[in-house]
């Protein structure tokens, strides 16, 4: 009877979900292929930088993942959002977050919501080395960074404004508000809560991930002695509500590693990732005896059961170097793998096709979610701004898709045409007094003080 109870418990832990082609086949890596460096998305230059450090010898895993993050935060080779200061929050603030975990003892250091300090991964490393804490946030994190010798940097607002102004002129779409008034899908605020009786059934909002426009990257290093480190770096979701902390800084959400079993990197919609801690779940699935392929698939299905709108990917690596991945909501999820065989470095970009998530969601929640609207100019004739919204309804297992087209008024189109002129006006004012600026005086923002932090990097 005792044996049966244990078997039943184990079966519950390892119960596979419905079969689907969510993951790439597991790649068994011979010991001679180690060390191993894996990074999310197709940023080969950053992976190469990390790999150069890792192959210098054993016990270089920590320095390797840090070097990968440093390359991304100091260059534009990991996309505009990470290196180009193009992911402001809704108030125009630029902040970074980063995290580092040691698989030997689960030591963890992270920062979030930190403005004015470029070297976010370096500050996260200092949190791990010099404090008993795991996560520091906001202005206090910046003060800690300065105390550790990191310098604040001033950055021009030009790049930020290039992203922020079109968003403001487009009625702040998309944003992260719900159940507020005025309606969040047609306004910039200021918002206040809707009375409970007026709140509608929750609509899931999808946030597509554009190729090359990723706001988070993760690195995982495994050496020949079995040491694991993982690190993550993020500029945060564009137009997020100020004060929001993302998955890159939360233990188990974006990264996790344990020398005894393996590690994982997760990326995608951070607010969903933080609710499920997929990197931690994947590592615990390895501990329970699952393969990297089945672990990645099971975790991805768990997310999709509750969040049909999820976009993102997950890479899982065993302590022996076997790796696999799963993804949802993307045309393709790519990650870079570097290793060594017979003294020669080998690097490849893995790309997996994601299953249509509507085929996966058979027992999950029902309801509606909307693809973020895209604004395009009609070709030929008079310029008319067209807003196309794809509405997908899941009811009783039957999918239906509706397309709605809304032709905006001419005055909205005229505002868009004048955008460049307004932007020049803003920049000229910034050149004269690069401190606080109230954009609403120019008619470019909602009727509340719009404040740019003075310190940018």
Curated annotation (Swiss-Prot):
- Is the Flavoprotein keyword given for this protein? no
Q: Which GO terms describe its molecular function?
A: N4-(beta-N-acetylglucosaminyl)-L-asparaginase activity
Q: Which Gene3D superfamilies match?
A: (Glycosyl)asparaginase
Which cysteine residues pair off into disulfide bonds? 72-78, 172-188, 327-354
Q: Where is the signal peptide?
A: 1-20
* InterPro entries referenced in this protein's UniProt entry, alphabetically: Ntn_hydrolases_N, Peptidase_T2
Taken from the record, one Pfam family name reads Asparaginase_2
Please verify whether the record's keywords include Disulfide bond.
yes
PANTHER family in UniProt: L-ASPARAGINASE, N(4)-(BETA-N-ACETYLGLUCOSAMINYL)-L-ASPARAGINASE
The similarity comment for this entry is: Belongs to the Ntn-hydrolase family.
Q: What is this protein called?
A: L-asparaginase-like protein GL17509
Q: Could you tell me which species this protein originates from?
A: Drosophila persimilis (Fruit fly)
